[in-house]
Amino acid sequence: MHPIQSLIEQAFENRAEITPATVSPELKAAIEQVITELDNGHLRVAEKNGAEWVVNQWVKKAVLLSFRIRDNAVQDDGVNRYFDKVDTKFADWSQARFQEAGFRVVPGAVARKGSFIAKNTVLMPSYVNIGAYVDEGTMVDTWATVGSCAQIGKNVHLSGGVGIGGVLEPLQANPTIIEDNCFIGARSEIVEGVIVGEGSVISMGVYIGQSTKIYDRETGEVMYGRVPPGSVVVSGNLPSKDGSHSLYCAVIVKKVDAQTRSKTSINELLRGV
């Protein structure tokens, strides 16, 4: 157990009573320590243990508590002014700090303090929220949003306008997770703690939440909340039992392994589905 976990857990039970005026110095320091460790990647809201993801709920609780202990304040990044409770990640970064971190941030990109960005990542004009973890070699494309506490794997491509849901608004139990080597097509939305398995390809305009049916056309199986590894997914519809209407679903049209994916472009995988 982390040394400050019990303090965070206890404070969360009494969170309604915590304000910037009433928070104890000990609790404030503990919360700020969690945000700092999230920011540098030493802590994560969720970690993979074997084949399963384990959520560190106490870390998520610390993120939520951080909004209780600070007042809004004016922030200035040299171009824009903000009025918020959470600092921007790069507010005091020097050129040397950016070079050491080893990722690229283009004008218009915003990341909040408490998010982690790994080496060889590119942030186009996009938004990365507090508690999020973006792993190595990932592209966060223009107008993509990585929600609070979301976990993005290695070598992921989040295309233009993609939305990866957070846990803060509305409050969710588990973070949304995109595993390594996934491609998420433009304007798609993955939310509500859905897990997209390693090596999957999500086509443009696919929306998946916990209540979305994920239909495997090869097996006829319907599943919820998790896209199996290596899935190629497009948007579709499933008819009602009486045939009077159909409702939206996500359709797994094929499965691909790493070898096939390495030899095949994304466009080719999505053709002829």
Curated annotation (Swiss-Prot):
Pathway this chain belongs to: Amino-acid biosynthesis; L-lysine biosynthesis via DAP pathway; LL-2,6-diaminopimelate from (S)-tetrahydrodipicolinate (succinylase route): step 1/3
GO MF terms, alphabetically ordered: 2,3,4,5-tetrahydropyridine-2,6-dicarboxylate N-succinyltransferase activity; nucleotidyltransferase activity
UniProt entry keywords in alphabetical sequence: Acyltransferase, Amino-acid biosynthesis, Cytoplasm, Diaminopimelate biosynthesis, Lysine biosynthesis, Repeat, Transferase
EC supergroup of this enzyme: transferase
A single cellular component GO annotation: cytoplasm
Entry's EC annotation: 2.3.1.117
Subcellular location: Cytoplasm
Catalytic activity: (S)-2,3,4,5-tetrahydrodipicolinate + succinyl-CoA + H2O = (S)-2-succinylamino-6-oxoheptanedioate + CoA
Residues noted as binding substrate in the record, renumbered to the chain: R104, D141
GO biological process entries: diaminopimelate biosynthetic process; lysine biosynthetic process via diaminopimelate
Main location: cytoplasm
InterPro entries: DapD_Trfase_Hexpep_rpt_fam, Hexapep, Hexapep_transf_CS, THP_succinylTrfase_dom1, THP_succinylTrfase_N_sf, Trimer_LpxA-like_sf
Key word Ubl conjugation present: no
Family: Belongs to the transferase hexapeptide repeat family.
Subunit-level organization: Homotrimer.
Name of the featured protein: 2,3,4,5-tetrahydropyridine-2,6-dicarboxylate N-succinyltransferase
